[in-house]
Regions:
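A short SAM/SAH-binding and catalytic strip from SAM-dependent methyltransferases
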Residues: 94-107
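Conserved alpha-helix/loop element of class I SAM-dependent methyltransferases that forms part
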Residues: 9-27, 39, 43
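A short acidic, Gly/Pro-enriched loop at the edge of an enzyme's catalytic core
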Residues: 85-95
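C-terminal alpha-helical "lid/dimerization" subdomain adjacent to the S-adenosyl-L-methionine
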Residues: 129-174, 179-188
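C-terminal lobe and adjacent flexible extensions of AdoMet/dcAdoMet transferase-like proteins
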Residues: 192-197
Length: 197
């Protein structure tokens, strides 16, 4: 959304992007669910430095087309118009969900997280950056709640449910997956890493 994106752009964008780029290395294959505002794609492509494959999917062809100029210098970037729930045979070292889940109904959140896990290599990871519940004293908590209810009806569930809770049940408690969560900006944003081992 315009207002929420403006908040992140003004105050936190570089830090939020760094959550992703800190987890990615040159030579890896990366799958990104949805195009993102701002400099995410540029930062990821730069970090990968032309090696590995950076695959970006979005259900919207106009969004994909709009992204072309910003990623054109990197030949390892692949763009695809695709429904997130459609499986792929290719396996990736990292799956990125950057402000994707809050746009989806809870049932779709579950489908997309399952697809993300299914797309990982045996030691791959999911990197999910999205909104979370701001702390009680956060100055924009109550205006944001009203805004969400009017314009982002699927965002508020991330206030009350962990991203982990949308993963398939067998993966939530699996000893073969390490879950880590951190928050920033008074709890407004979260980063969840799910690392296979």
């Amino acid at each position: 959304s315009t207002v929420m994106t403006a908040v992140s752009n003004c105050f936190m964008q570089k830090r939020l992007i760094r959550y992703v780029t800190d987890e990615i290395h040159a030579g890896q294959d990366v799958l990104q669910f949805g195009t993102a505002d701002g400099g995410l794609q540029h930062a990821v492509a730069e970090k990968m430095n032309g090696s590995g494959v950076y695959h970006i999917e979005d259900i919207s062809k106009p969004q994909i087309d709009a992204l072309l100029p910003s990623i054109s210098p990197w030949l390892n970037v692949r763009l695809n118009v695709r429904d997130f729930s459609n499986p792929t045979d290719r396996k990736y070292d990292a799956a990125v969900l950057f402000f994707t889940l809050h746009e989806l109904p809870d049932a779709r959140k579950e489908i997309v997280l399952k697809r993300a896990f299914d797309a990982l290599t045996s030691h791959g990871k999911i990197i999910a950056v999205d909104y979370a519940m701001p702390c009680a004293y956060h100055p924009i908590k109550h205006p944001l709640r009203l805004f969400n209810r009017l314009f982002e009806p699927f965002a508020e569930s991330l206030w009350y449910k962990d991203i982990k809770s949308f993963a398939p049940a067998n993966l939530r408690e699996s000893k073969n997956i390490i879950w880590a969560k951190s928050t920033t900006f008074g709890g407004l944003y979260q980063c969840v890493i799910a690392q296979k081992r």
